[in-house]
Design a protein with these regions (language model features):
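Active-site HxH/HxHxD metal-binding segment of metal-dependent hydrolases
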Residues: 44-47, 54-129, 151-152, 212-219
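Short Gly/Pro-enriched turn/cap motifs at secondary-structure boundaries
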Residues: 27-29, 112, 132-136
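Conserved beta-strand hairpin/beta-sheet module of binuclear metal-dependent hydrolase folds
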Residues: 13-68, 142-157
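Metallo-beta-lactamase
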Residues: 68, 137-221
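Short, well-ordered secondary-structure micro-motifs
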Residues: 37, 60-61, 108-111, 143, ...
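Short glycine- and acidic-rich boundary segments immediately preceding or forming the N-terminal edge
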Residues: 1-16
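Divalent metal-coordination and catalytic microenvironments
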Residues: 39, 51, 77, 89, ...
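Short beta-strand or tight-loop elements
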Residues: 20-22, 124-129, 139-141
């Protein structure tokens, strides 16, 4: 298997990263380059999908690339482009539905588990930590996997990208909230080798982005 790069294109194949206890599959599922991530517990085969963003047929194929069944779907935030296929995926898989508490009522299906900062999400023998990053939306959540045999892995939705935090649409209060949370809850607590996976586009590491934090705050976006 080729080395994981995180570079995927709409209509193209998944990129796959094999960790000791977890397999991560990344696929681009829309013309907006929305990323969907399928996480598979290697011990039990149970699976969790992050953001059923679009293209239900592609997402079903992604699930089949793993073990073929889906246990849970987490929606990172309320924006329409991150849950266009959620209703279809839930209908066809029966997966449990999780989302940030403040965004849950905006989703097209009932949310069974409303997530808040510090919660844990488990599937199989895998545990993810919930990090609320307030600003892009009130209920935006990131999911952290602490690999016992390597660097941490962080799924950030639209709250953190290579080159800056997520869009806060000119709202200075929301921007301050987001950049504060990203600094305090991500960069202040996690190591530089933490790999993060955003809701659109390419991945990065915290070490690559850390030198630019003051620049992001100063420019205001």
């Amino acid at each position: 298997m080729s080395e994981y790069t995180g570079e995927v294109v709409h209509g193209g194949p998944s990129d796959v990263r094999e960790l000791a206890h977890l397999t991560i599959r990344k696929a681009s599922v829309s013309e907006q380059d929305n990323n969907a991530y399928l996480l598979t517990c290697r011990a039990t085969g149970e699976q969790l999908l992050i953001d059923a963003a679009d293209d239900p047929h592609r997402l079903r194929a992604l699930v089949d690339e793993g073990t073929g069944w889906l246990d849970a779907v987490v929606t990172t935030h309320r924006h329409w482009d991150h849950h266009r296929a959620l209703a279809d995926v839930v209908e066809h898989t029966g997966a449990r539905v999780l989302a940030g508490a403040q965004d849950a009522d905006e989703l097209p299906v009932p949310v069974g588990e409303r997530l808040t900062h510090g919660d844990r999400v488990t599937f199989g023998e895998v545990e993810l930590e919930v990090i609320q990053l307030r600003g892009h939306t009130p209920g935006s959540v990131a999911l952290l996997y602490r690999d016992p045999e390597g660097p941490a892995h962080l799924f950030t939705g639209d709250s953190l990208f290579p080159g800056g935090v997520g869009n806060t649409f000119g709202d200075a209060v929301a921007f301050a909230s987001l950049v504060d949370d990203v600094e305090q809850r991500v960069f202040a607590t996690l190591d530089d080798d933490t790999w993060f996976y955003p809701g659109h586009g390419k991945d990065s590491t915290l070490g690559a982005e850390r030198p630019h934090l003051a620049e992001w705050r100063a420019r205001g976006w």
